[in-house]
């Protein structure tokens, strides 16, 4: 692990910085000249550099080939800049595209931005440098109308092929009431059905060769092994997969667009629905990013409570993943065991938050309320129960010779391939890369906890599922420390932008009463800036990149989810394998479609 510099570790997370002291700024200036860039000061915690469109690919290639390279395109998307009022010192732009690159060896990130005019929405594709740019560029074109020249297949990915318009543009309606009433005529229904017909030629596939015809099989979007509304079109030669095309978007709900119409506070419940098994884990990156904008430092008790709830939901999600993986391989019983154990997690979560799957319990500056009396006993009972149950899963199912035979060596990939496709979480650690955000870039007090990061070597299905078992043990270890070392103190920060403000002060001071009224009715106004927060979520790295224009609502909410990148990788891994191997591979990825489609 590469430590961040002393200046990084001592500066408050919310301080606005230009990061000119980051070595990469000097490297870029030496290579391209200081006049080639505009460095933007933000609260993202990384250098944000505006580059000229003509130099973009050259700059990305340079960073990709440095001695300590930026090996992963972590995220790529766009921003409609036309209504943004706080842009002092930035290049003129109607739209912009940002490229978030990550370096494992440096443990650092950099964000490149390109300014575009509405009359010339073109930029070169980055797919030849980072193959995972494919889906991100398709989505950016679909949402903003920005064309990526040279892209191999620039078509819609989230919306139906018949959709008109670019939904994340500021002039595109955000609510159904702003559209004309929807009417599905028989003719339109036929057109919609026709658009779903898979045409191999559109994807560069052949229907057959001189000697044989290929079969095309739709797996999903309603199939128990597709783990949600997900279609994957298989090109088969007998049982062998020649090629495949994942088809996503059936679960798309416009989560990022909703962020532009909800207050900073009222958007919290929407975060729970991004990865619906993650609960409070989903809320963590959002509230931390908002707190960076606001300049809020939360009490230690809040940090530890957030860690405790996050690890409870991590255990809950991992239990479902392990049991359904075993079911995909062919064993039924562990699923019923797992739901018994998950019920205990939900009972504990419900006792603390009042809700089960979607608690919406974290707040800007704290949590909704303090821990209830008796929480220690409930947590103690669970910590005494769970370790033995984990042992039974391993002994009864995961050491089974049939399961091993179907998963060892299946759908294996190495660290280089994982990084090229943006794989994070257990999928990356199974290849031997010990990258866990909780350890490498601690947040919410994780630096105060003693736990290990399990790592695999083979990068196959069996490694991925066994890593999750070990991660469960480490989560129990973290919960044990929460039980023994829960700090005293308030459950909210004493800050003007804490939302909602402490209610007990509203009847004593007119100023706090006014603040309470405004923040509960209209919502708090966050300072104009940009912030970013990534967390180690249940399925990989989840992050929020927020842009504030000094309003009660976000100007741009970008949600980067791990499952999106993981599904894009499927064709490169599964070509040449059997259909039965694909089922095991899908079960080993650990995804839900709400996390993919947002």
Curated annotation (Swiss-Prot):
Keyword line: Cell inner membrane, Cell membrane, Membrane, Multifunctional enzyme, NAD, Quinone, Translocase, Transport, Ubiquinone
First-level EC class: translocase
Which Gene3D superfamilies does the annotation name?
Cytochrome-c3 Hydrogenase, chain B, NADH:ubiquinone oxidoreductase, 30kDa subunit
Kindly give the InterPro entries that the UniProt entry links to this protein: NADH_DH_suC, NADH_DH_suCD, NADH_Q_OxRdtase_suD, NADH_quin_OxRdtase_su_C/D-like, NADH_UbQ_OxRdtase_30kDa_su, NADH_UbQ_OxRdtase_49kDa_CS, NDH1_su_D/H, NiFe-Hase_large
E.C. code: 7.1.1.-
Claim: Membrane is one of the keywords in the record: yes
User: One MF term from GO for this chain?
Assistant: quinone binding
Q: How does it sit in the membrane?
A: Peripheral membrane protein
Task: Outline the segment boundaries, as ranges, of region: NADH dehydrogenase I subunit C.
Answer: 1-189
Q: Where in the cell is it found?
A: Cell inner membrane
Q: Give the GO cellular component terms, alphabetically.
A: NADH dehydrogenase complex; plasma membrane
Tell me where it mainly resides: membrane
Region annotated NADH dehydrogenase I subunit D sits at 213-598
Which family does the similarity line name? In the N-terminal section; belongs to the complex I 30 kDa subunit family. In the C-terminal section; belongs to the complex I 49 kDa subunit family.
Name of the protein this chain belongs to: NADH-quinone oxidoreductase subunit C/D
According to the entry, what is the taxonomic lineage of the organism?
A: Bacteria, Pseudomonadati, Pseudomonadota, Gammaproteobacteria, Enterobacterales
């Amino acid at each position: 692990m590469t430590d961040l510099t002393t200046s990084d570790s001592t500066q408050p997370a919310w301080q606005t910085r230009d990061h000119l002291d980051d070595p990469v700024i000097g490297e870029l200036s030496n290579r391209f000249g200081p006049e080639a860039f505009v460095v933007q000061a933000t609260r993202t915690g990384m250098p944000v550099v505006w580059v000229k469109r003509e130099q973009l690919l050259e700059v990305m290639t340079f960073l990709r080939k440095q001695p300590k390279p930026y090996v992963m395109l972590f995220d790529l998307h766009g921003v409609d800049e036309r209504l943004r009022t706080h842009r002092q010192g930035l290049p003129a732009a109607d739209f912009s595209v940002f490229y978030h690159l990550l370096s494992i060896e440096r443990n650092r990130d950099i964000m490149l931005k390109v300014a575009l005019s509405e009359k010339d929405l073109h930029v070169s594709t980055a797919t030849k440098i980072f193959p995972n740019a494919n889906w991100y560029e398709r989505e950016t074109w679909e949402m903003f109308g920005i064309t990526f020249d040279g892209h191999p297949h620039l078509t819609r990915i989230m919306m139906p092929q018949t959709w008109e318009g670019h939904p994340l543009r500021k002039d595109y309606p955000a609510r159904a009431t702003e559209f004309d009433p929807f009417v599905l005529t028989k003719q339109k229904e036929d057109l919609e059905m026709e658009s779903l017909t898979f045409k191999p030629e559109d994807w560069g596939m052949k229907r057959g060769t001189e000697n044989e015809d290929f079969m095309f099989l739709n797996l999903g979007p309603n199939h128990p092994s597709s783990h949600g509304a997900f279609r994957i079109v298989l090109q088969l030669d007998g049982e062998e997969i020649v090629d495949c095309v994942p088809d996503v978007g059936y679960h798309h709900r416009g989560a990022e667009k909703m962020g532009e119409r909800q207050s900073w506070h009222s958007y919290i419940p929407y975060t729970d629905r991004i990865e619906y098994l993650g609960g409070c884990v989903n809320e963590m990156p959002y509230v931390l990013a908002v707190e960076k904008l606001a300049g809020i430092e939360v009490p230690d008790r809040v940090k530890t409570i957030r860690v405790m709830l996050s690890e409870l939901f991590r255990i809950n999600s991992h239990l479902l993943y392990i049991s359904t993986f075993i079911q995909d391989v062919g064993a039924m019983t562990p699923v019923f065991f797992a739901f018994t154990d998950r019920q205990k997690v939900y009972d504990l979560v419900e006792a603390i938050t009042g809700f089960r799957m979607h608690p919406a319990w974290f707040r800007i500056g704290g949590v909704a309320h303090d821990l209830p009396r008796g929480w220690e006993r409930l947590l103690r009972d669970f910590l005494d129960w769970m370790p033995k149950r984990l042992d039974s899963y391993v002994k009864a199912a995961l050491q089974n010779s049939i399961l091993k035979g179907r998963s060892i060596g299946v759908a294996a990939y190495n660290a280089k391939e994982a990084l090229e496709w943006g794989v994070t979480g257990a999928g990356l650690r199974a290849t031997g890369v010990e990258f866990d955000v909780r350890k490498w870039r601690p947040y919410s007090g994780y630096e105060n906890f003693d736990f290990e990061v399990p790592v695999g070597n083979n990068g196959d299905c069996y490694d991925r599922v066994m890593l999750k078992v070990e991660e469960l043990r480490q989560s129990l270890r973290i919960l044990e420390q929460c039980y023994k070392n829960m700090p005293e103190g308030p459950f909210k920060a004493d800050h003007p932008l804490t939302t909602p403000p402490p209610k007990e002060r509203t009847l004593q001071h007119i100023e706090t009463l006014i603040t309470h009224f405004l923040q509960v009715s209209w919502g708090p106004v966050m300072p104009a800036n940009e912030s970013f927060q990534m967390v180690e979520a249940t399925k990989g790295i989840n992050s929020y990149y927020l842009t504030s224009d000094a309003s009660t609502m976000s100007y741009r909410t970008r949600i980067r989810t791990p499952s999106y990148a993981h599904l894009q990788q499927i064709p490169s891994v599964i070509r040449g394998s059997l259909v039965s191997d694909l089922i095991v591979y899908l079960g080993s990825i650990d995804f839900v479609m709400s996390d993919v489609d947002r």
